[in-house]
């Protein structure tokens, strides 16, 4: 690996970004370590201006990554990544920029006759008949100096992105399917993807929360939101603040005084450190009106008629996707397809991605037929 391929100063980064901004598209990728922190620790950023001109940007040496932010936010130059969301979040956090004009080769593969969950290794092999070396997947990207093998591995992750994009676009059947892909890609431009505001729906990911009564679920929601903010503030994993099972224990007893936490498995140290915060979160939940409390997310069973409709929906998606060269998984997972049927038959009003945009267009005939027969 040539030394000039490593970018370790803001001045050199500016030069590379200025070259990138004159191009129609560049490849981007990151290498990071994510073990004992809330946020991934950025170890390397790779950029491909062409198949031959690739650079490794060292964020441990460069304190000012704002030039990279300028490239990320630029609406003219396409930034090509594979499985883009996590890399974009990391680079957005490092630069403060909101990414714009993104092309995700993993997503695009699902519109081009392949699967939307394909790895870069598989995709490059499938589309370019080139084998990538993945022996450095578990390497420590924070350790310096990086070896020649590490640098070669990292740059090969961006080297083929531009060519892969061209091939994928050539395999998409017609302008309508391309517009559907672009609609999906446009979602990556949304600033909400990169927000640092704690998500109030995080409690839903706590296993077992639906076994609680409604008031306790409200407490779990408030504590989970507080925990998210605290984990970000400390840059520690959520479980280092409070583990999920302890969070559920606390929510079940709804403590209003710190000493009540002695009835749970929370450590003495954590109770002393976070007791007041936990009780304040509990109080916020208990002060809510019944109508403002979250509901239990119970799984309802489908009737035999609904099961028949679900089977028809899956068959329609499979057949239509086969004709159009689209991965059926892009239309929705099993729970989403079940919700479609429940919405049609039970009149449930749930916000679904299948109720707008290209998915609604794809499924419009099915919707019409079943609305007419119910």
From Swiss-Prot:
PANTHER family: RIBONUCLEASE D. It comes from the Bacteria. It is found in: Cytoplasm. InterPro entries: 3'-5'_exonuclease_dom (IPR002562), HRDC-like_sf (IPR010997), HRDC_dom (IPR002121), HRDC_dom_sf (IPR044876), RNase_D (IPR006292), RNase_D-like (IPR051086), RNaseH-like_sf (IPR012337), RNaseH_sf (IPR036397). Keywords: Cytoplasm, Exonuclease, Hydrolase, Nuclease, tRNA processing. GO terms for molecular function: 3'-5' exonuclease activity; nucleic acid binding; nucleotide binding; ribonuclease D activity. HAMAP family: RNase_D. It catalyses: Exonucleolytic cleavage that removes extra residues from the 3'-terminus of tRNA to produce 5'-mononucleotides. This is Ribonuclease D. Gene3D superfamilies: HRDC domain (1.10.150.80), Ribonuclease H-like superfamily/Ribonuclease H (3.30.420.10).
């Amino acid at each position: 690996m040539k030394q000039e391929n490593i970018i370790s100063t803001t001045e050199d980064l500016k030069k590379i970004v200025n070259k990138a901004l004159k191009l129609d598209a560049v490849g981007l990728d990151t290498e990071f370590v994510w073990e004992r922190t809330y946020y991934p620790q950025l170890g390397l950023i790779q950029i491909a201006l062409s198949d031959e001109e690739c650079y490794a940007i060292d964020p441990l040496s460069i304190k000012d990554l704002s030039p990279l932010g300028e490239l990320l936010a630029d609406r003219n130059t396409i930034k090509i990544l594979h499985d883009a969301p996590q890399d974009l979040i990391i680079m957005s956090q490092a630069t403060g920029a909101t990414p714009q004009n993104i092309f995700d080769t993993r997503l695009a593969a699902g519109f081009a006759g392949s699967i939307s969950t394909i790895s870069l290794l598989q995709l490059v092999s499938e589309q370019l008949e080139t084998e990538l070396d993945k022996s450095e997947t578990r390497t420590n990207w924070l350790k310096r100096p990086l070896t020649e093998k590490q640098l070669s591995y990292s740059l090969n992750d961006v080297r083929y992105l531009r060519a892969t994009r061209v091939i994928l676009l050539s395999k998409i059947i017609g302008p309508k399917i391309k517009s559907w892909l672009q609609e999906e890609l446009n979602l990556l431009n949304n600033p909400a993807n990169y927000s640092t505001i704690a998500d109030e729906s995080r409690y839903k990911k706590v296993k077992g929360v639906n076994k609680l009564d409604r008031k306790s679920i409200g407490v779990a929601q408030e504590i989970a939101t507080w925990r998210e903010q605290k984990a970000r503030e400390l840059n520690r994993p959520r479980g280092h603040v409070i583990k999920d099972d302890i969070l559920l224990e606390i929510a079940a007893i709804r403590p209003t005084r710190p000493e009540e936490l002695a009835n749970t498995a929370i450590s003495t140290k954590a109770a002393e450190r976070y007791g007041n915060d936990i009780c304040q979160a509990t109080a916020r939940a208990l002060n809510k009106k019944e109508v403002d409390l979250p509901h239990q997310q119970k799984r309802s069973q489908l009737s035999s008629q609904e099961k028949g409709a679900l089977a028809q929906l899956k068959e329609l998606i499979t057949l239509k996707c086969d004709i159009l060269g689209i991965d059926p998984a892009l239309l929705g997972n099993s729970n989403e397809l079940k919700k479609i049927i429940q919405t049609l038959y039970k009149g449930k009003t749930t916000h679904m991605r299948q109720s707008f945009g290209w998915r609604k267009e794809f499924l419009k005939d099915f919707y019409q037929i079943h609305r007419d027969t119910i």
